[in-house]
Amino acid sequence: MRRSFSILFIAALTTAVMGQDASSNSAKWKHYVRGGGVLVTNDNGLSGYYRINRSSRYTFGDLRLYLYGLQNNSYVFIRYKSSSKYRRWPRFYRFSTIAYQKNTQAGVALRYHFNQGLGLFVLPYTQGHIISEIAHAYDMSDYLNDNRRTSYARGGLYWDHDTKWVSTKLEVEYFHQISEEVAENLSRTQAMAEIIMPITKGFSAIIIYEIESYPDSDIAVAINQGSLSFSIGWKGTIPWIL
């Protein structure tokens, strides 16, 4: 487990360094910290979040860490995503994502996830954008005490909207299992809704609802549960020129 965690970190760091483009001197670094409480069915606890990203005209790198410490369960999620726009068609971009997840509430003691695909800014506008993505993805997990790889076709829709008083985010992803190596149907839908309300310079109050649903799985009864979290967050810039 420790070795796999190290591989994940090295892969993310390598992608961040190798993914830099010629416009490095225009790159902007930001980081975000959040802490608060989380409520799920018949359980509650504390939540923590850290995010750091680097963006330039054509490239974007984003590393996120989520931690939920519940009374009876725990949730850990680490994700690194890198993307680069096509210079001739800047509304299109290619991306890759690598992630590690542990979710005892959903019966996921361990999952390594990877996906690669194509994204499109369907509707960019002044106050936000709507993005769609398609990708090929795979998991290596322990749902069935089995480490065989499970492959998926993945689609996603993402909407970000900002106003002077509040920012909102809506994400919906569907993973359709295409691998037949694992008998269990692990096709799933993941959704997240987020509201960010500014408090003072750099600080905000954040409300998030998330759900992961396995409608065709025999273990769905134990998994179709959402979480509601409330946190206070801070964001700032990092004066790096990497």
Model-derived regions: residue spans:
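Repeated loop/turn-to-beta-strand initiation elements of outer-membrane beta-barrel proteins
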Residues: 56-63, 87-94, 126-130, 162-170, ...
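Transmembrane beta-barrel strands of outer-membrane/channel proteins
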Residues: 35-39, 63-69, 80-82, 96-100, ...
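Residues that define the transmembrane beta-barrel architecture of outer-membrane proteins
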Residues: 27-29, 44-48, 74-78, 110-114, ...
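Outer-membrane beta-barrel "beta-signal"
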Residues: 224-242
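Outer-membrane beta-barrel transmembrane domain signature
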Residues: 131-204, 210-212
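Outer-membrane beta-barrel initiation region
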Residues: 20-71, 86, 204, 236-242
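Outer-membrane beta-barrel domain signature
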Residues: 22-26, 36-43, 68-73, 103-109, ...
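Residues on the lipid-exposed face of transmembrane beta-strands in outer-membrane beta-barrel proteins
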Residues: 37, 48-56, 80-86, 116-120, ...
